[in-house]
Amino acid sequence: MFMYPEFARKALSKLISKKLNIEKVSSKHQLVLLDYGLHGLLPKSLYLEAINSDILNVRFFPPEIINVTDIVKALQNSCRVDEYLKAVSLYHKNSLMVSGPNVVKLMIEYNLLTHSDLEWLINENVVKATYLLKINAYMINFKIDLTVDEIIDLVKDIPVGATLHLYNILNNIDLDIVLRISDEYNIPPVHDILSKLTDEEMCIKLVTKYPMDNVINFINQDVRYSPTFIKTIKDFVNKHLPTMYDGLNDYLHSVIIDEDLIEEYKIKSVAMFNLEYKTDVDTLTLDEQIFVEVNISYYDFRYRQFADEFRDYIMIKERRQITMQSGDRIRRFRRPMSLRSTIIKKDTDSLEDILAHIDNARKNSKVSIEDVERIISSFRLNPCVVRRTMLSDIDIKTKIMVLKIVKDWKSCALTLSAIKGIMVTDTINTVLSKILHHHRNVFKYLTSVENKEIAVCNCSRCLSLFYRELKSVRCDLRTDDGLLDRLYDLTRYALHGKINQNLIGQRCWGPLTEMLFNENKKKKLNNLMEYIKISDMLVYGHSIEKTLIPITDSLSFKLSVDTMSVLNDQYAKIVIFFNTIIEYIIATIYYRLTVLNNYTNVKHFVSKVLHTVMEACGVLFSYIKVNDKIEHELEEMVDKGTVPSYLYHLSINVISIILDDINGTR
């Protein structure tokens, strides 16, 4: 099976024959080239057709001809702004900045605005400062004025760290506001304005309320040296030992002489105040032993010989080992992270790097087609190879050489590979080619049925079912029947264009997003499934629909990938659709094994899961054989988090059958 359908290969041949000038091919071929991303930069004459095909095509036009509204739509449908979309966005930056608060929010998330841009927006009253601060307070690094009501309203909606940053940029910050925010929202008053507070009792209250936040550093100097204040803080520190507050210890060290601290705290003074104190481990009191063990990381750093001796002492005396303890004991406020970004992590061996290598080799010596084909073969499953090749800076002759190879790529449908010792037909290449061929047909079908109630739907697939009501209305999720009934309903909803991308508390973790979009899922499967016990896996019956979204609303930009690796929005949504069905399969099996701890008749249950999914999709007379070795693989999946390759293979077989059935090619 060819990677591209015949009409797409024919259109690409015409483009190659015209020296890659898309304006010189027929309008029929132009539309095909646009639909399959078989193009580079685009001419003005194809603007409407390209935008209608996929809004992200806006980035491939000269910036001066682009409509600002189209740029906005492109930004809304992206995860990352690549160099092309960034260029057209910056060209129209002034127009975008006055296109409304939501557009400004997008531009901030994509890092398209400078600090001076934000200052201009506030000074010109285009957007309110509070709006920008709620998006990302750290972007504002210049002084602003806010009313008390605005400050209080803002504090309700931003993290603690952002509030502390806000204190530093306000012109009109005063002590009353800081204290009010502390009382009402429990945000530490760590600001120089606190030094104006001379009420010793209030200062003590604040320091002891926030012992980890170094409020002590902002206390009035007269209060800090008050004997009563010193004694109260020391009593507070002593009361909470062996827990240590580094900031308070530093304060005590600054107001009490070393000799007095050593006399009172002895070996504890090493960890608390970084003082030198020598002693034998066998002379320690029980209280001191507990303190040293809890704070062993301090001794590892400040008095390693003693720490080693203490470990040996405990091993001999109590026959137990004190492990190394390390970590950052300083509390840090984490800045909010956006799903959107302008940063794209570059692969070490990207397609662009390889193309440049081929181009240089061509110029210096003769390069055979066989060599080029071998070098780029690792990108066989990438549907965007043609577009990325045409957008590259290599010579046109090299581009044509590569495109001729890509045009004739075939999926390896008959290749045999060993998975867990089982010889199986490798269908992954065929499935990927099928999705590339038919994604628009599948998308058209799913959008045609997404508004139908599945219990009363009269579509051709529902009419063929033996059971058309919701199966899981009354089900026991502790049983196989309950799990299968819920899976049946989930899959029926999916076939009617409604999916749950977040079934286990993780999004897009299945094999298709990983293989098609080069997603790097470093987490083991058992780590991905860590919240399965409290996830939407517990939802069944009529409540299922509340957890679903239409396939048309499944945001393809949620895939954390370079947009250059996504063919178009419809393609990404169909990949998400089939990937979600595989996730349903894997999650159902994993839930039975781990949550229910049921390992009986695993092979039989896996077979039931696969056939339940096909039945829910209206595929009633297909059979998939499951090998006995599935049981060992699933044990490894649960115990070690290893990827269940054979189960993935079986699941891909299932979606291949479903895809053929939807497309009418089965």
Swiss-Prot record:
It is found in: Membrane. Belongs to the orthopoxvirus OPG074 family. This is Protein OPG074. Induction: Expressed in the early phase of the viral replicative cycle. It is a single-pass membrane protein. InterPro entries: Poxvirus_E2/O1, Poxvirus_O1. The chain crosses the membrane at residues 574-596. Signal peptide: none annotated. Coiled coil: none annotated. It comes from Vaccinia virus (strain Copenhagen) (VACV). One of its GO terms (cellular component) is membrane. Keywords: Early protein, Membrane, Transmembrane, Transmembrane helix.
